[in-house]
Amino acid sequence: MNKTGYILAIARGHNAGACLLKDGKIVFSIEEERFSRRKYDGGPYAAMIKTLDYTDKIDALVVAHTQNLQDTAGKVDYSGDDVYTGIARKLKLISPYGTSGFGAQHPQVHDLSSIHHKLHASCAFYRSGFDRAVAVIADGAGTFFPLNNERQESVIGYEVESVFSCEYPANISTIYKHMGTRDIMQFYEGPISMDDPLTGPENFYTIITDRAGITKTYEAVTNYCGFTE
């Protein structure tokens, strides 16, 4: 069996899961907690193995998260590839010869961690039925961005609110982004340029603050009231 036209998309963080597509149609979609029986479980390892029930080869592994694979996903001993690339390689879903090893990026693996809010916008837009729309995303912490404060110290910023212009079939552009940080940060308001791994550089309006954003405020209140798992 050597099927082609398959894309395996995985989400790494809480509520981790996998979705297998064949020529743009969903073959299966499942969260890791269905295998592990642990609510909201991360690391969709069992979900990736489930792919073998449908195909022994995929054309691409697409990874969604808020932080990049190379720095945060853990490493396979000796070869140095991240654990998700390593699992796909060892299961022979992707080519075992795709990299020179020792941490190199596999050409069949696509890390979309730098556009986390845009992925949320895409999910909303493609399920909406609209040909054109504006998507507003409010999130606890989207993509992690390295920033420098007024003292030129390195701090981490997080996407907290974003606005996107969406047009079918595949034009989703950033209009506005609010980035927050837990560190001391001078308020910034104005244009900024960031790279999209799919479409290249993007220019949009942004504000950077030392505030957590709407969603984290809501989360703090619900946690205080005991509305947790």
Task: Describe the role of every protein-language-model region.
Residues 1-229:
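Short acidic/glycine-rich loops and adjacent helix/strand connectors
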